[in-house]
């Protein structure tokens, strides 16, 4: 079929949420003429649920996005109202930053960034169909009948894809926050042959700040010590007048109200059909599943400086409006609170992610990429990370350049994408530190060391950032080398000082680096013995030095594991392999191989239901059966 196109682009991105914004900024910054199409321009980078960025694992993803040249970290650093480092009492592998956002300012700032970006056209329009010829994307069709040509299309529709809002007995077609749902596009994705799933998520009610009795709650302030998501942000710009959050709890009365109205809860009445998030359950689900708990935490989170709306984190619900009011008034501090918005659930279609490659391109259609909640994830950060990778690979494909695949040992983004394309997901996927087997080398403090060079190679890291990175890396390398070259000897003067500080004396000569491996010796103590660096070091470099030195043995073991896995990742599996021709592999393994069609031995080994014996048989088969190459 010959199409008459009214406009032509290199890449078209459908949806301007957190995934779509990162995807479109990446493609345009890499030199591709890009269209970012959205149902509603006023909802660009909107936060329909929690007014925050970061958190456990997620905060590290934002740092990775920033290190690669993405925008989320810079944007939240300009628009937060509170910043807090989590898990400070635990090891460095699980520390992560979380910011409370001014949600309207966040969206406005991001929209301004998109509007200023060269090569990027922003358009309010509904995309109804993706045009495909001979298994390859050629463009899109709008609801008004316009046809736009494209060499690649990135679908980032979030929860709008056949979205339906559920509130008590009420259910109606809608995207998030009562925006339009994208129904025709959902139908057409299915017609293209993609396997579609149905998920559900929810959001809590918002209450009016001036109606809250804060005296009955516990204050949750931000940190005084400067921390940032972007490696380019300055400590001098760290916000001093942060806005606190507040902690309260449900109680037995709250639980009684929920239990007495479970028959009206869509979660239990059968109205909700989609699968909900395991790690962000509704309050009614929590009360039923954890009936022995006397109370559940609720955090009162301001949604910005210029609004009275307060997000009641932990109270996600789709109970009827009258029940929500009673529930709120049963909570300490909220006895007289005014409910400004009701909580609700939303069901939406997803593209089952086992149909994707690690580039986030669909296996079925060349040039068609998907990212974000469209792939079954939950969270703004997971969406933004996928959007960035999908956008990068869409641009690389258009330009005929090698694709970018982040491995599990490269980034949390790599862990997430590998989980999605290798294992799929039966529920909204959330990143957790426990999902990363190499988490000690995927830390908050070293995301730039891991990824900035990659961002530079693909054209997303500008000269200013690259220069700052080179200075930091040189300072780090030089100081590490210096600490490893200076020796402390167990002489009387040295040991007298060591003992004065309350530490065990030296029995053998050791380098300053070895001295720092002692749990009680920090960088400041070490340099008090050996003298300071040639130039003043930033606190973030000192933090990185302490972590790398104190955990060196564990880090080395992790890197050894990475090297072993790399060898398995380098063993490619032909695209045209006949899985039925391989004798002796288990039936379950054969079925999984057919469904996922892994690209490497490493990926095959991570598929659930596949055991080491199956991998051994597969490797023997490949060694004796040709060297066909995988092509897309």
From Swiss-Prot:
It is found in: Cytoplasm. GO terms for molecular function: flavin adenine dinucleotide binding. The gene is mnmG. Pfam families: GIDA (PF01134), GIDA_C_1st (PF21680), SAM_GIDA_C (PF13932). Gene3D superfamilies: FAD/NAD(P)-binding domain (3.50.50.60), GidA associated domain, C-terminal subdomain (1.10.150.570), tRNA uridine 5-carboxymethylaminomethyl modification enzyme MnmG/GidA (1.10.10.1800). Homodimer. Heterotetramer of two MnmE and two MnmG subunits. FAD binds at residues 15-20, 127, 182, 373. Keywords: Cytoplasm, FAD, Flavoprotein, NAD, tRNA processing. Its cofactor is FAD. NAD(+) binds at residues 276-290. HAMAP family: MnmG_GidA. Belongs to the MnmG family. This is tRNA uridine 5-carboxymethylaminomethyl modification enzyme MnmG. One of its GO terms (biological process) is tRNA wobble uridine modification. InterPro entries: FAD/NAD-bd_sf, GIDA_C_N, MnmG, MnmG-rel, MnmG-rel_CS, MnmG_C, MnmG_C_subdom, MnmG_C_subdom_sf. One of its GO terms (cellular component) is cytosol. NAD-binding protein involved in the addition of a carboxymethylaminomethyl (cmnm) group at the wobble position (U34) of certain tRNAs, forming tRNA-cmnm(5)s(2)U34.
């Amino acid at each position: 079929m010959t199409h008459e196109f009214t406009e032509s682009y290199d890449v078209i991105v459908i949806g301007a949420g957190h995934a779509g914004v990162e995807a479109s900024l990446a493609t345009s910054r890499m030199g591709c003429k890009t269209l970012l199409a959205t149902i509603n321009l006023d909802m660009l980078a909107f936060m329909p649920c929690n007014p925050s960025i970061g958190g456990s694992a997620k905060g590290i993803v934002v740092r990775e996005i920033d290190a690669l040249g993405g925008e989320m970290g810079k944007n939240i650093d300009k628009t937060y109202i509170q910043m807090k480092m989590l898990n400070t009492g635990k090891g460095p592998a699980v520390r992560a930053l979380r910011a409370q956002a001014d949600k309207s300012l966040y969206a406005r700032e991001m929209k301004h960034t998109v509007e200023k970006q060269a090569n990027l056209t922003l358009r309010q329009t509904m995309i109804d169909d993706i045009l495909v010829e001979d298994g390859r994307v050629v463009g899109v069709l709008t609801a008004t009948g316009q046809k736009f040509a494209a060499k690649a299309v990135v679908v980032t529709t979030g929860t709008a894809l056949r979205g339906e809002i559920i509130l008590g007995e009420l259910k109606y077609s809608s995207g998030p926050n009562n925006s339009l749902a994208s129904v025709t596009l959902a139908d057409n994705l299915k017609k293209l042959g993609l396997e579609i799933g149905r998920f559900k998520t929810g959001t809590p009610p918002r209450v009016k700040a001036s109606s809250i009795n804060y005296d009955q709650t516990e204050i949750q302030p931000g940190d005084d010590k400067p921390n940032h998501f972007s490696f380019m942000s300055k400590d001098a710009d760290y916000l001093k007048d942060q806005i606190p959050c507040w902690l309260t709890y449900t109680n037995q009365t709250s639980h009684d109200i929920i239990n007495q109205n479970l028959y009206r809860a869509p979660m239990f009445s059968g109205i909700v059909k989609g699968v909900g998030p395991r790690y962000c359950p509704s309050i009614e689900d929590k009360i039923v599943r954890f009936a022995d708990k006397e109370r559940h935490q609720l955090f009162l989170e301001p949604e910005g400086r210029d609004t009275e709306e307060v997000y009641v984190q932990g109270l996600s619900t789709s109970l009827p409006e009258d029940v929500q009011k009673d529930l709120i008034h049963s909570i300490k501090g909220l006895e007289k609170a005014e409910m400004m918005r009701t909580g609700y659930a939303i069901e939406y279609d997803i593209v089952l992610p086992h149909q994707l490659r690690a580039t986030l391109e669909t296996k079925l259609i060349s040039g068609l990429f998907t990212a974000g909640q469209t792939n079954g994830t939950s969270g703004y950060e997971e969406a933004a990370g996928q959007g960035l990778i999908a956008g990068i690979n869409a641009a690389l494909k258009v330009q005929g350049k090698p694709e970018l695949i982040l491995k599990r040992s490269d980034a949390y983004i790599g862990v997430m994408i590998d989980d999605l394309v290798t294992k799929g997901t039966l529920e909204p996927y959330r990143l957790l530190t426990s999902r990363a087997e190499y988490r000690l080398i995927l830390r908050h403090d070293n995301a730039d060391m891991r990824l900035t060079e990659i961002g530079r190679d693909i054209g997303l890291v500008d000269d200013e950032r690259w220069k700052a990175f080179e200075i930091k890396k040189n300072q780090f390398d030089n100081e590490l080398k210096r600490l490893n070259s200076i020796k402390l000897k167990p002489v009387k003067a040295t040991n007298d000082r060591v003992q004065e500080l309350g530490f065990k004396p030296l029995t053998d000569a050791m380098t300053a680096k070895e001295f720092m491996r002692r749990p009680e010796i920090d960088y400041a103590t070490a340099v008090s013995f050996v003298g300071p660096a040639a130039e003043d070091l930033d606190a973030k470099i000192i933090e990185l030095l302490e972590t790398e030195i104190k955990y060196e043995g564990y880090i080395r073991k992790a890197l050894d594991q990475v090297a072993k896995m790399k060898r398995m990742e380098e063993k490619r599996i032909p695209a045209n392999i006949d899985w039925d021709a391989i004798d002796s592999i288990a039936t379950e393994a054969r079925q999984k191989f057919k469904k996922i069609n892994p690209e490497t031995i490493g990926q095959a080994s991570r598929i659930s239901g596949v055991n080491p014996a199956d991998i051994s048989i597969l490797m023997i088969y490949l060694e004796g059966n040709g060297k066909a190459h995988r092509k897309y």
